[in-house]
Curated annotation (Swiss-Prot):
It comes from Arabidopsis lyrata subsp. lyrata (Lyre-leaved rock-cress). InterPro entries: CASP_dom. PANTHER family: CASP-LIKE PROTEIN 4A4, CASP-LIKE PROTEIN 4D2. The keyword Membrane applies. GO terms for cellular component: plasma membrane. Belongs to the Casparian strip membrane proteins (CASP) family. This is CASP-like protein 4D2. Residues 1-14, 82-150 are cytoplasmic.
């Protein structure tokens, strides 16, 4: 005899999960916008050098992590909305939630860590080479890197909470 199907989660839990998915997507979209528009022109000895986010490998990794995280968040948002509307959850979604939330949360966390690390290291290097103050465009470039990394960190926190809920859901199911 098959075990009875698990009872559906309360509506407040479903709304919380939906809100966390939306917040994850919003944080990732804002991080993508800030990071992808991040550039600076450095004028040195009469020549101008345009410096983009894509010139820093860690920022590229951040961008990749944010894009992959956003794709996952959008897919999960559709599944969450469909579950919310129908009241039924496909058994495959338990596995997708469980493994996907963990994998993507770690990807986003490492993207955030890479952004914080490279922003600090490169900013310290620029301070050592030239007198850098808070009005310098180079400082603003790294501040935008910090902002993007912070937003990735916030999205990681949302994904980590979702990961806990998906772990509990799969434990209840089994």
């Amino acid at each position: 005899m098959a075990p009875p199907p698990p009872s559906p989660p309360p509506v407040s839990l479903k709304v919380s999960l939906l809100l966390l998915r939306v917040l994850t997507g919003v944080f990732l979209v804002i991080a993508l916008i800030i990071l992808s528009t991040n550039s600076v022109t450095i004028v040195s000895q009469g020549s101008a050098l345009k410096f983009h986010f894509k010139d820093v490998y860690a920022y590229r990794y951040m961008l990749s992590a944010a894009v992959i995280g956003l794709l996952y968040a959008v897919i999960q948002l559709f599944f969450t909305i469909s579950e919310f509307a129908t009241g039924m959850k496909n058994p495959f979604n338990y596995q997708l939630d469980f493994y996907g939330d963990k994998l993507i949360s770690y990807l986003v966390a490492t993207g955030s860590a890479a952004g914080f690390g490279v922003s600090k290291d490169l900013k310290d290097a620029f301070i050592a080479l030239v007198a850098l103050d808070s009005t310098d465009p180079v400082d603003k470039f790294f501040s935008r890197g910090y902002a993007s990394a912070s937003l990735l960190l916030f999205s990681f926190i949302c994904l980590a909470v979702l990961s806990v809920f998906s772990s509990l859901a799969i434990a209840k199911r089994n």
